[in-house]
Amino acid sequence: MLDIVELSRLQFALTAMYHFLFVPLTLGMAFLLAIMETVYVLSGKQIYKDMTKFWGKLFGINFALGVATGLTMEFQFGTNWSYYSHYVGDIFGAPLAIEGLMAFFLESTFVGLFFFGWDRLGKVQHMCVTWLVALGSNLSALWILVANGWMQNPIASDFNFETMRMEMVSFSELVLNPVAQVKFVHTVASGYVTGAMFILGISAWYMLKGRDFAFAKRSFAIAASFGMAAVLSVIVLGDESGYEMGDVQKTKLAAIEAEWETQPAPAAFTLFGIPDQEEETNKFAIQIPYALGIIATRSVDTPVIGLKELMVQHEERIRNGMKAYSLLEQLRSGSTDQAVRDQFNSMKKDLGYGLLLKRYTPNVADATEAQIQQATKDSIPRVAPLYFAFRIMVACGFLLLAIIALSFWSVIRNRIGEKKWLLRAALYGIPLPWIAVEAGWFVAEYGRQPWAIGEVLPTAVANSSLTAGDLIFSMVLICGLYTLFLVAELFLMFKFARLGPSSLKTGRYHFEQSSTTTQPAR
């Protein structure tokens, strides 16, 4: 049976994965709606207004359910991860509060104006509202990813032994954290690809069915053009993310690449292999010479540190952490010796490694050799899940590049809809961005283990004092509710996608033309 920590992790993972089924589509469709409405305002063509209103229906369904699934996640920090909230709440809470007060209210206010302001606002005013919806959704992502980036790379903070908490020392440094910035642009770009692929695939289906061709063709063209820029951005920014990972998250990088030994620079990239955690080796490997070293370090003479060497470093830091913990106990018991304080300040960077021993003993300073060795093994994540999830993400990314690039080529050649196989590829490719983003988030979060806050707070000591029954009950309840939300989303999405622009009831589209003489929009 899973223990309390594992159950808490599982619950958060499930709610986060459910929530992130909705987030990328919101990010991507918001900008696509803004682009469509801008074309409408500039050209005056009714069809672009119809496109904005129809795709806006699907955006609205997704937005509402995304908000609903996101609410419980923040509450979990207090209910399931109370020590985490106590230990780092002053830092982690700041960007989340800003997101709620500024970005979310901006987004939600203007979403209402987007849907109900068509007959109350001028064309330019409504277009500005749509752009503000897009801006608000991206600002929400920015502040959430600033918080998440700090969990990965906890700069701009310092441990205060008097309060037993991490405290912020520089807000600007927190916001400009390079890991947070790279995660932000990579994540929102993946959302843009998701939105583009969603519209591309449904538009392709309309053309395959021979209906609403003018509407579908224009939607396809905008989605392919926007998607082309987005998918190239995702790949470039993914490379930048790998470079940052090699700089500040060496353990995660080595685990993703199943890099057990430190290879001579530049390291080879393992295209495919079978990692064996127990033997600390790969049973089978197909490698591309020099590729990993060049991608991860952007040099030919800097090595990528292997997991075995990293574990040696971690063992040393665990032993230093034991000393830091012993000094902390002296300070907490009232010692005023300046030498003790100075020594603690010089060693507190390794205190988190000492806390890895809390899983095995309450008295960290007196841990046995066997416990130290076990904590050292715990200092790296499970390799195989990360290794394969990363490759699934990359494979989906390059499949998306191929589909979107071919679609964009058909747009610039003015041959949209001529290749039935391409339309089918666009339709069947709709799930690919979701697979990629879910795999990517798994890599980001699972790869940080065993840390809740990188090298500061182990996951094993960050949880609340709940019972297994509490967690199982709440998990079943939340996941059951989220499953109902997902079913509702799929039902409504399929319903309105099948109706297409006929759902606008303008009399201009497929299901209405048999009973009206109104001409199709142009």
From Swiss-Prot:
Cytoplasmic compartment segments: 36-54, 115-128, 204-219, 408-423, 488-522
Coiled coil: none
Cofactor note as given: Binds 1 protoheme IX center (heme b558) per subunit.
GO molecular function annotations of the record: electron transfer activity; heme binding; metal ion binding; oxidoreductase activity, acting on diphenols and related substances as donors; oxidoreductase activity, acting on diphenols and related substances as donors, oxygen as acceptor
Catalysed reactions, semicolon-separated: 2 a ubiquinol + O2(in) + 4 H(+)(in) = 2 a ubiquinone + 2 H2O(in) + 4 H(+)(out)
Amino-acid positions noted as binding heme b b558 in the UniProt annotation, renumbered to this chain: H186, M393
Localization per Swiss-Prot or TrEMBL: Cell inner membrane
Transmembrane residue ranges: 16-35, 55-69, 97-114, 129-146, 187-203, 220-235, 391-407, 424-441, 473-487
Taxonomic superkingdom: Bacteria
Binding site for heme b b595: H19
Stated name of the protein: Cytochrome bd-I ubiquinol oxidase subunit 1
